[in-house]
C-alpha cells in the first residue's frame, strides 16, 4: 500500500539515551538511503520498556509532530502493560496507513529499498 520503508530494531538493555542510540541505528541501518526519504524506524528496548520512533525528513515534513506523538501514545499504552508485540503491530499499522496517504504504492516504479527483516542489535556502542 505504500512505497515507504518501515523497519524495526530491537536492542538489548543498556543505560543511557534511547533516542541517541536509535539515531545511530537509523544511520547504521541506512534509513536515509531511500529515494523519497520516507523511512520510519521503530527502535525498541523491551527490557527497559522504552522505544523511539524516528522518521526520515520527507515523511516528517508531511505528517508533523502530532503524528509521532500519536504513535508514541499507542506504543506507550501497550508497553506499560507488557504488550510489546500488540503495541508494535498497532503502531506499524498506523504508520503504514499514514505512509500510504503520502507515499502510495506504485507497482510500476516501487523498489524495496531496505531489508524487510527485524534488526536485533547485539551490542550498543556509545
Residue ranges: model-predicted function:
Residues 1-125:
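Divalent-cation
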